[in-house]
């Protein structure tokens, strides 16, 4: 199954497609952030698309997923791709490379349990260390106090 959440300019097209094709795809629309966090923990992975690369930008969805321990299927390049690869948080495909994304979805669904558990653990570890909001805020305060 593939469960899609969110809005945006293609929401109506997605709704129409899902309604007219019985392919195990479900579109849920937009949910409030807290409900979304709760919902995401029910799934094995989450797709993070980044169609337009912005130098220095990392999709905020990455930071939302890490503390939930949800492995990532990243579709994009740049810093987001590097973070996912270097920290073994999931699998990566180029923007628009639907063939690779499809292969990554299949690969993720067939990972041995130990490898899958390690991806989840890597997500949780990174959320508590490098990308811990409180730690980043303290580092920022120390940086500002130096001036």
For the regions a protein language model found, what residue spans apply to each?
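Short alpha-helical segment that forms part of, or immediately flanks, the ligand-binding pocket
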Residues: 37-41, 59-68, 81-82
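Nucleotide-activated donor-binding/catalytic signature segment of Leloir-type glycosyltransferases, i.e.
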Residues: 3-6, 11-37
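Short glycine-rich donor-binding/catalytic loop of glycosyltransferases
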Residues: 51-52, 70, 74-81, 95-96
């Amino acid at each position: 199954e593939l469960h899609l959440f969110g809005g945006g300019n293609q929401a109506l097209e997605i709704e129409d497609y899902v309604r007219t094709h019985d392919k195990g795809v479900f579109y849920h629309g937009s949910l409030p952030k807290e409900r979304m966090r709760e919902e995401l923990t029910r799934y094995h992975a989450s797709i993070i698309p980044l169609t337009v690369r912005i130098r220095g930008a990392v999709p905020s969805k990455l930071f939302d997923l890490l503390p939930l321990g949800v492995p990532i299927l990243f579709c994009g390049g740049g810093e987001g791709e590097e973070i996912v690869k270097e920290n073994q948080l999931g699998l990566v495909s180029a923007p628009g490379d639907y063939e690779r994304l499809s292969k990554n979805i299949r690969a993720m669904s067939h990972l041995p349990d130990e490898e899958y558990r390690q991806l989840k653990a890597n997500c949780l570890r990174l959320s508590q260390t490098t990308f811990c909001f409180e730690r980043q805020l303290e580092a920022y305060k120390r940086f500002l106090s130096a001036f």
